[in-house]
């Protein structure tokens, strides 16, 4: 439980222990990569990470497919397979025996079919994606969002995200994971989170009916609230914002003769395919200035949060993400064969795996594509760069509405 | 490889994102274009007021003289372009290669743009109805008849979200610089050549570079230009027009539905006007909003349609560098196929006949691996009811519609250019009063034969300036 010992907020420890699950079954959660001693021999680190992933995979499959701990959904699904997950999954690559996960399975109820028996009775959340029209996709969560963001916390530099300082969360709340997750991150680091909500479903509706002025007015309404909070003396030093909202906030502050830096913010994380190398550079050089740290993240409700490779001028603003292995894995696969990895530097579609006690996803085809990247010392497994909407969907996808 | 930067108030900017612009036939990358992002535009527009300040250091007359010089440079000089240079022949070649417009049409568009620049002073005199230019510069002044007038600039810059495939639209923004208003251009992804060449020509003619921004980029760039410029023009389809309808900040240019109307007094002589009709439909490959998409008459419509079909139906695509090439290619994948399918569907309606098919050796749609052609199509409609009677496509296409003269004005709907062949004073008066016709030609004028001293889709002076009251002394006692 090393993640807890790093917290500067003792009451959180208590909460986490109370919420800890299944005391009789130990799932080894290997330390997040940043906690690993830097091993000079990258290939050794890669092998070690691979071994951990294999072990974690087996353990996760055992949990989800064992009649005493598995979820009704997977136990039912297993009956349709021509293989036995309990005996025939011996490493991560064996997950390819599963048919691809269909995200349509996440639409509709009952949501309880996703709760593993081993976690029955725990307080559960539902987070949703999509949902502008029709039934949204739902994911049941108990504590994954906390764990994901605690792990992410360990990658944040304290000098830019000072522990004990307060946060601004500028993005969607409602049925999304973000608000609760960022709020937990703030609390985990000993701070309090101030939240400004944005309803992306409403923005999509406005844009679809061509009401650009309405969407702009709504964005202004959101930004005005953020400006007010920042001016209210709450000692806010850290922020999460979507790229569009951060941009609007920074420009609004400039219009008022001040800036993100002058408002006291020293560290920001933002995410999504709109966080492009050009936008990264624009942020550092013009929008925020050199004294405000910004780091990209990539993730979704299903996967958790992938971290950006630490900024290095030599990268020329290339953004490379690494999944929080072994809890989640990102593969970059061929467009015409989703079981085949592309070569390093080559372009492919993003395939996600989620391997936590709460959720098992053996290969979900994300709506993004990118280039496969080599492992990094800090993250000794494959990364992905240049994430952008999958070209076959790009023209029909509304991106970056918030 | 030609590398084309973003231009931020005259300064080249290298982006982290570059997009190749490719030859429509071969897919070969012809240039790498640096891509702006929306935030960067919003950031730059915070300094927009400077552009007008800089331009007001010159008189409008001086700027008009610079336009004359720029016209010559644009038409004849070898000018810098990104990390290379470009002469006029190279300009036409690359514009043709990315837009699918034959080289001879690119050259014709060049001459048209240059003409407008050369005659800028007359154009402005016409559009301002002889207003002394210093009134626009100072915001107010005394007219020669002793009346105080005031024209207040409504913006420091004009934003333009330009189309990808239509090099003919650039004349619209050329008067902006001499009107002492800066230019913020978001070029179309396939037709950035005119904006960049014109920028360089203006700069070399003495216009300070600091009054220009050129932002090649994605949709967010167009959005940022539209959001931050107090006055903007955008080009698009009916949906775009609808979106900006009633927004005083925006002039939206879309389909023209331009038409030729033959009055009952002249329709019996229709054969005399076949050249005028064919040229209105066909020139510039029918790609302009000012190209005629309809010929309306109360009688002889079948014969008119047949004559037009006989003239245009056999015309086939030729290589882009063939001086006789007259058909432009469709370079957007699937567009021609979809249009063709839509036409076939609309032809199924009773009373609609395609007349050109019998004069064409082969199909209307000629698909290639990376591009397509649609061959000229003439349709006859026995009434104005079928949807195809009032349709416009980006190729030489026209419906010849039978309609009684007394119903014509009502039935033609919105019409950008209406060429009306009549000498009937009563009908002429009705045509003059018809508010659904924007540019009215009464007489033998092709729909695409624009006089540059006339306003186009609204007077740009009225768009950029507002006439208002100004007094610096009390009025006479009354």
Task: Name the predicted role of every residue range.
Chain A
Residues 40-63, 84, 189-402:
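Active-site glycine/GP-rich loop and adjacent strand/helix microenvironment
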Residues 17, 27-128, 134-166, 171-175, ...:
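Nucleotide 5′-phosphate-binding alpha/beta core
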Residues 20-22:
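Intrinsic-disorder-associated, low-complexity terminal segments enriched in Asp/Asn/His/Tyr and depleted
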Residues 2-8:
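Extreme N-terminal basic, low-complexity initiation segments
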Residues 177-182, 280:
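Short, highly selective alpha-helical patches that border small-molecule cofactor pockets
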């Amino acid at each position: 439980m090393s993640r807890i010992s790093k917290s500067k907020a003792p009451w959180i420890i208590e909460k986490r222990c109370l919420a800890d699950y299944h005391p009789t079954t130990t799932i080894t959660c290997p330390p997040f990569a940043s906690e690993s001693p830097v091993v000079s021999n990258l290939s050794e680190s890669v092998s070690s990470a691979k071994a951990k992933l294999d072990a974690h995979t087996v353990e996760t499959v055992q949990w989800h497919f064992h009649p005493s701990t598995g979820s009704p959904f997977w136990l039912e699904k297993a009956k349709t397979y021509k293989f036995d997950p309990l005996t025939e999954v011996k490493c991560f690559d064996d997950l390819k025996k599963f048919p691809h996960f269909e995200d349509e399975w996440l639409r509709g109820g009952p949501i309880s079919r996703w709760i593993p028996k081993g976690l029955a009775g725990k307080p559960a959340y539902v987070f949703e994606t999509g949902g502008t029209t029709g039934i949204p996709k739902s994911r049941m969560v108990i504590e994954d969002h906390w764990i994901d963001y605690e792990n992410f916390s360990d990658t944040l530099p304290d000098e830019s995200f000072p522990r004990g300082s307060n946060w601004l969360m500028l993005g969607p709340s409602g049925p999304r994971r973000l608000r609760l997750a960022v709020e937990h991150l703030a609390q985990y680091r000993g701070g309090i989170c101030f939240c400004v909500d944005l309803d992306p479903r409403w923005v999509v509706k406005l844009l679809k009916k061509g009401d650009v002025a309405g969407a702009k007015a709504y964005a202004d309404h959101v930004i005005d609230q953020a400006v007010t909070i920042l001016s209210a003396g709450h000692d806010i030093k850290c922020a999460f914002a979507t790229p569009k909202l951060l941009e609007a906030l920074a420009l609004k502050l400039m219009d008022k003769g001040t800036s993100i830096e002058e408002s006291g913010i020293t560290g920001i994380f933002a995410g999504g395919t709109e966080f492009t190398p050009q936008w990264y550079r624009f942020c550092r050089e013009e929008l925020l200035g050199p004294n405000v740290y910004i780091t990209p993240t990539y993730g979704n409700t299903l996967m958790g949060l992938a971290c950006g490779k630490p900024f290095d001028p030599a990268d020329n603003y290339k953004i490379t993400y690494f999944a929080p292995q072994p809890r989640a894995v990102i593969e970059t696969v061929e467009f015409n064969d989703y079981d085949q990895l592309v070569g390093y530097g080559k372009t492919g579609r993003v395939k996600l795996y989620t391997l936590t006690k709460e959720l098992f996803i053996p290969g979900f085809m994300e709506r993004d594509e990118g280039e496969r990247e080599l492992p990094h010392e800090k993250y000794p497994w494959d990364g992905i760069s240049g994430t952008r909407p999958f070209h076959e969907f790009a023209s029909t996808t509304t991106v970056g509405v918030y | 490889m030609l590398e084309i930067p973003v231009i931020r108030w005259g300064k080249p900017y290298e982006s982290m994102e570059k997009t190749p612009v490719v030859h429509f036939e071969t897919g070969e990358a012809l240039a790498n274009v640096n891509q702006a992002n929306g935030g960067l535009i919003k950031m730059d527009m915070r300094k927009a007021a400077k552009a007008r300040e800089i331009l007001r250091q010159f008189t409008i007359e001086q700027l008009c003289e610079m336009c004359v010089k720029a016209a010559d440079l644009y038409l004849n000089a070898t000018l810098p372009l990104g990390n290379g240079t470009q002469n006029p022949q190279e300009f036409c070649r690359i514009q043709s290669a990315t837009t699918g417009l034959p080289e001879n049409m690119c050259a014709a568009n060049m001459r048209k743009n240059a003409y407008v620049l050369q005659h800028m002073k007359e154009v402005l005199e016409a559009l301002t109805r002889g207003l002394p230019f210093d009134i626009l510069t100072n915001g107010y002044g005394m007219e020669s008849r002793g009346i105080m007038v005031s024209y207040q600039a409504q913006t420091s810059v004009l934003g333009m979200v330009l189309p990808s495939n239509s090099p003919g639209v650039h004349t619209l923004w050329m008067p902006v610089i001499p009107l002492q208003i800066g230019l913020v251009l978001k070029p179309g992804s396939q037709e950035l050549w005119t904006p960049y060449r014109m920028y360089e020509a203006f700069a070399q003619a003495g216009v300070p570079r600091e009054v220009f921004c050129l932002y090649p980029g994605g949709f967010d760039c167009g959005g940022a230009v539209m959001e931050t410029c107090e006055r903007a023009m955008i080009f698009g389809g009916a949906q775009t027009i609808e979106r900006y309808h009633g927004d005083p900040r925006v002039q939206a240019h879309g389909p023209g539905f331009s038409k030729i109307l033959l009055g009952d007094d002249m329709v019996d002589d229709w054969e005399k006007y076949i050249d005028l009709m064919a040229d209105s439909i066909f020139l510039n490959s029918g790609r302009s909003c000012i190209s005629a998409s309809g010929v309306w008459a109360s009688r002889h419509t079948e014969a008119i349609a047949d004559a037009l079909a006989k003239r245009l139906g056999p015309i086939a695509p030729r290589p882009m560098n063939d001086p006789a090439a007259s058909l432009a290619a469709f370079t957007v994948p699937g567009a021609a196929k979809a249009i063709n399918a839509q036409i076939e569907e609309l032809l199924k309606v009773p009373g609609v006949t395609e007349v050109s098919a019998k004069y064409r050796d082969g199909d209307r749609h000629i698909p290639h691996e990376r591009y397509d052609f649609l061959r000229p199509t003439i349709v006859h409609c026995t009434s104005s009811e079928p949807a195809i009677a009032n349709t416009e496509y980006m190729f030489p296409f026209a419906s010849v519609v039978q309609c009684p003269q007394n119903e014509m004005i009502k039935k033609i709907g919105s019409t950008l250019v209406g060429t009306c062949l009549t000498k009937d004073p009563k009908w002429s008066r009705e045509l003059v009063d018809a508010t659904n016709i924007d540019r009215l030609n009464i007489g033998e004028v092709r729909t695409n034969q624009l006089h540059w001293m006339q306003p186009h889709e609204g007077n740009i002076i009225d768009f950029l300036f507002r006439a208002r009251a100004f007094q610096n002394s009390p009025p006479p006692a009354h």
